[in-house]
Amino acid sequence: MAVCTVNGQKEREVHILATNDMHANIDAFPQLAAIADSLRERYPSLLIFSAGDNRTGNPANDMFRISSYPMVALMNEVGFDATALGNHEFDVNSLPPLMRYSGFSYICANIFPSKEAGLHIVPTKVFDVDGLKVGVIGVVQVNAQGRPDTHPDNVKGIRFALPKNIVAQYEEFSRQCDATILLSHIGYQDDIEMAETYPWLDLIIGGHTHTQLTEDEPLHNGVLITQNKNKLPKVTHITLTIKKGKVVGKKAEYIDVKSFPVKSRMVEVMVDYFSNNPMFKRVVGYAETPFKTKDELNYLMCEAFLHEGQADISIVNNGGVRLDSLAVGDITMQDVLSMDPFYNEAVEMHLTGEEILKILTTYSRGSLYHLPRVAGAVCEVTVDKNDEHKDRLKSIRLKTPDGQEFDIHKTYKVVTNSYMQSACKSYVSDPGHSLNIQTSVMLTNYLESLGVIKCKGMQYMKVTEE
């Protein structure tokens, strides 16, 4: 592990610009670059960090010749110093070449790639800020299957360890540094647990759960935690005050990106170049009514699977749709590929009603947010009325669309995506087979067959509190 020397007697400041879960929102980069430039004018030694999930969510980035190269080029131009690995960094097998183009470091302590994986990752890095030693440790979330939330084929040859267990190994590293930062892609609640367990951390720059924090966020066991919503609505300017080798002051300022009055002209030119693909402008349908929420778009995807796959039931994981809303008007390939950027294939499975319920129960992990969405059946769920977020599931039942009892012994033709197939195939009887069509193509075909669509709302889910 790298070693840092304790430095200095008088108070000095380290300034950091932090992002998380940018999800390829390259349109925000002209203002992000201007924010970075304005801070760098005042603080020439400014550090710029990302907490991961830089890619996935914009076809101009995700479908570029080298997938996600636009984000890397723009991050280089802004002057990023390092990024954590997010689970979506593994969505497409373009990470090794991207690392060769990156002018910043990839930091992750709980990943152990084989030599064949071709990944150039460091567990920690020490940044020299005018003689102050700022140590950074990186971590990525690991699910119950022992990997980040991505298709298992994307992480072959890579072993992961639980973040909490790994961070414990770096306490001595922190003692040698003037400031210690955890660049974390594990989620807000897990960041709080990290702070409670490891008070020697000075700062956690968080991501993964898209939690919008504010200047009023209290310190957690003395540790400052920051995070923003996804797609760059805000960035965080962090000031660490250091005296005698210890952090004696911590402050976070959240800056609104969209309303920032200045744009970088150079970055605007780069964004225009990356976005100039006529394919994205092709119209595939018309939305007669708006789709106001991601859940309404989840059910549009479910309907596409149901009808195009000629299925009895369709299942879509809640994270399978990446667009938050859709306005009235033309629906373009840009919209389709923003909704479904994952290159998943449509998969057919033959499952009993009991197995379908098991998928919903197991995958949801007791959370309404994580509950997969279905079409062809109505999912009746009860949430705990005492839960502040109304997310804790108490029960899940399925009914037929006309309100009859769902036959759990009957075998149904189910169409889902290859990510869901990989997540559930270990506890169902039929591993399924590919329909040899990408889910984005299936969605496109469905929209083109309808021509005009209307939002049907939440017709396949009923939520009650108890």
Language-model regions: role of each:
Residues 4-259, 265, 296-304, 348, ...:
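Acidic, metal/ion-coordinating pockets
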Residues 9-13, 19, 41, 169, ...:
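Catalytic centers of hydrolytic enzymes
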